[in-house]
Amino acid sequence: MTSTTRRGFLSLAAALAPGAAIAHHGWGGYDTSKSFTVTGKILKSTYENPHCEIEMEIDGKHWRFVLAPPSRMERRGITPDIIAAGKTCTVFGYPHTSNPDEARIEYIIVDGKRVELR
């Protein structure tokens, strides 16, 4: 590899690296000073990357709860059928700072089993 080619490659890699670093949304958008716990029936569940999600209606409000990635869910014993629509669960989490219908979930209790997601 010539010096010019190497410099070009390194410049390209450096230019693309910040995009990869911010591609994941992170958890900074959730207010950890306002934790809550709710119990309800799962209306819909999504078991795919980047994060699994469940939707529930609590006291007339429709919520979207962001869970862990599928690989972590599987390692902790939470399979798609465990969080399927129609199941009842309890979640503990933090509300999103700008989306009032979304929350990040720290742990879920389903089928009598408490599972830490972070």
Q: What are the residue ranges of the model-derived segments?
A:
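OB-fold/S1-family single-stranded nucleic acid-binding modules
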Residues: 97-118
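Short nucleic-acid-contacting surface segments enriched for D/E, G, S/T with interspersed K/R
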Residues: 75-90
